[in-house]
Curated annotation (Swiss-Prot):
InterPro entries: AAE_transporter, RCK_C, RCK_C_sf, Transpt_YidE_put, YidE_YbjL. GO terms for molecular function: monoatomic cation transmembrane transporter activity. It comes from the Bacteria. It comes from Yersinia pestis. Signal peptide: none annotated. It is found in: Cell membrane. PROSITE patterns: RCK_C. This is Putative transport protein YPO4083/y4100/YP_3992. Residues 192-276, 279-361 form the RCK C-terminal domain.
Length: 552
């Protein structure tokens, strides 16, 4: 068998064994995709024992390409929500996520200096303790660029593997300890969250308002500023028994009923000016109007603003809501359309059909992947990651590397959505498949390279000490941030658990947090809020630590 065929066969064996190990669960908790690392260690151990030689260049390429695929698809997935998560609504949660990364870095620095742990080893332990595989890849690359001996760099995978199991279990232990220490009642926390979230959430709401202000009588809709703002959409107007879609030139009369869509505070502002909220149905049932949901798939409208489509004037159709990546937005005139946007339309059936044809509404396109944008994005990411940044006093130029470059580019492209006919939308199933393939390839190679000396290091070397260091890097930040969040800001426990899981970019921990109260979405919401920023910081933090430690 050729060296290439043997290498591919061994990687397949590692993947099968590792994924099987990852499916093992103890009290509902398993290693998940991390099992591939241990599958690689087992196969790597026997490969060295029986002197099976694999193609080193091929392994190196597969490791780096797997990492690129993983971080790029992560960036595309979280890109649309990354920048919005930094706004006020998620600012507090993200501040705690930043604090956790900072505390973890400080603990790592103290252990490195106090116990004289070699830099590659402590960075490997750090990556495993926070269960973040891209951080391991980023640390390996920056240390290689800095000139660290290849033998030490190859040991990073062992440090990662030693710390990884407690990284998975440690966060669950911390959640349990916080619950025990503060004597938390889960049902009470869930009810408190539902009550608070129902009052404060920024989801869109509707309001039916009767026109009572005599100053508005005789004015057209376009002459009332609040009805033309980017915060509220007036989707229906009822006059007597007639229900219509209001045009910009439609004249308002006393006694008209307006159906408004927007966030609660914006709706209240309109109500104060227009009249009073009324309990009158403005349903399209039994009328000439109907509602429909259509999806944007036509390349010709990508990037265009809603006002440029002129749907009200041409077709007497109004867009009431815009759903992007699961987030409902006000369909303001200044909103630009992106591939995959879901639009709520109100109008006559024939007009809605015409508008559907304009925006595309081709459901099958949502299942197709444009490969050209994928490779453009990967190429740009690699180029960005290779650009050197020379800092006076540093022994090597700083780079985002093959982990940071594709991630930054993917975040930006995911946020932009499309450029011309190129769109970076990726169906969730395709994104997940590429992401899982990438991380399996990366972990397989890391495990194979680490397996030869793993048992010897654990039994006769410093393996047990590394496990202890990893436990400190896992536990201290989690306990610190968890206790502070609960004591200082009285954070809801379910929200707290989701925030901790998101800050560790740890899906098994999210599954555990969701299981605390299956009907509450508190944990999932806070996890999604902090995950994008946490993933970015987790990938960048070992590179920053590597450069700082290298110069000291």
């Amino acid at each position: 068998m050729s060296a290439i065929a043997l290498t591919v066969s061994m990687l397949a064996l590692v993947a099968v064994l590792g994924l099987w190990i990852g499916n093992w669960k103890i009290y509902g908790v398993g290693l998940g995709i991390g099992g591939v690392l241990f599958g690689g260690i087992i196969v790597g151990h026997f490969a060295q024992t029986y002197q099976i030689v694999l193609n080193g260049d091929m392994l190196h390429f597969i490791q780096e390409f797997g990492l690129i695929l993983f971080v790029y698809t992560i960036g595309i997935q979280v890109g649309p929500g990354f920048f919005s998560s930094l706004r006020v609504s998620g600012l507090r949660l993200n501040c705690f996520a930043i604090l956790m990364v900072v505390v973890g870095g400080l603990v790592t620095a103290i252990i490195h200096k106090l116990f004289a742990v070699p830099l590659p080893i402590i960075l490997g332990v750090f990556s495993g303790a926070v269960t973040n595989t891209p951080a391991l890849g980023a640390a390996q690359q920056i240390l290689t660029d800095l000139g660290s001996p290849p033998q030490l760099v190859s040991q990073m995978g062992m440090g990662y593997a030693m710390a990884y199991p407690f990284g998975i279990c440690g966060i669950l232990l911390v959640m349990w300890l916080i619950r025990l220490f503060f004597k938390i009642n889960i049902d009470r926390e869930a009810k408190a969250f539902d009550s608070s979230y129902g009052q404060n959430r920024e989801l869109l709401q509707t309001m039916n308002v009767a026109v009572r202000n005599p100053n508005l009588h005789g004015l057209s809709v376009q002459d009332v500023p609040l009805l033309n703002s980017d915060e509220v959409v007036c989707s229906r107007l009822k006059r007597g028994d007639l229900l219509m879609v209001p045009m910009p030139a439609t004249v308002i009369e006393i006694g008209d009923y307006l159906h408004l869509v927007g966030q609660r505070d914006a709706l209240e502002k309109v109500r104060l000016v227009v009249g009073e909220e009324v309990d009158v149905t403005l349903s399209t049932a039994g009328t000439a109007l109907q509602t429909a949901r259509v999806v944007v798939t036509n390349e010709a409208v990508l990037g265009k603003k809603i006002r440029d489509l002129n749907l009200k004037q041409k077709y007497d159709v109004v867009i009431t809501r815009l759903n992007r990546a699961g987030i409902e937005l006000v369909a303001s005139n200044s909103a630009s359309l992106q591939f995959g946007d879901i639009l709520n339309l109100v109008g006559r059936p024939e007009a809605i059909e015409a508008v559907s044809a304009i925006v595309g509404n081709a459901q099958q396109k949502l299942q197709q992947v444009q490969m050209l944008p994928v490779f453009i994005g990967v190429g740009l990411g690699v180029l960005l990651g290779s650009i050197p940044l020379f800092v006076p006093g540093f022994p090597a130029a700083l780079r985002l590397g093959l982990a940071g470059g594709p991630l930054v580019v993917a975040l930006i492209l995911g946020r932009i959505g499309s450029i011309g006919k190129l769109y970076w939308f990726m169906p969730p199933s395709a994104n997940l498949a590429l992401r899982e393939l990438g991380i399996v390839l990366f972990l397989s190679v890391v495990g194979l390279k680490s397996g030869g000396d793993f048992i010897n290091t654990l039994v006769n070397g410093d393996g047990l000490a590394w496990i202890g260091y990893g436990a400190m890097i896992t536990g201290i930040p989690l306990l610190t941030v968890g206790i502070l969040a609960r004591m200082l800001v009285k954070m809801n426990y379910l929200t707290l658990c989701g925030m901790l899981a998101g800050s560790m970019t740890d899906p098994p921990a999210l599954a555990f947090a969701n299981g605390l109260h299956p009907t509450s979405g508190a944990a999932a919401l806070s996890y999604a809020t902090v995950y994008p920023l946490a993933m970015f910081l987790r990938i960048m933090s070992p590179q920053i630590l590597a450069v700082l430690f290298w110069t000291l």
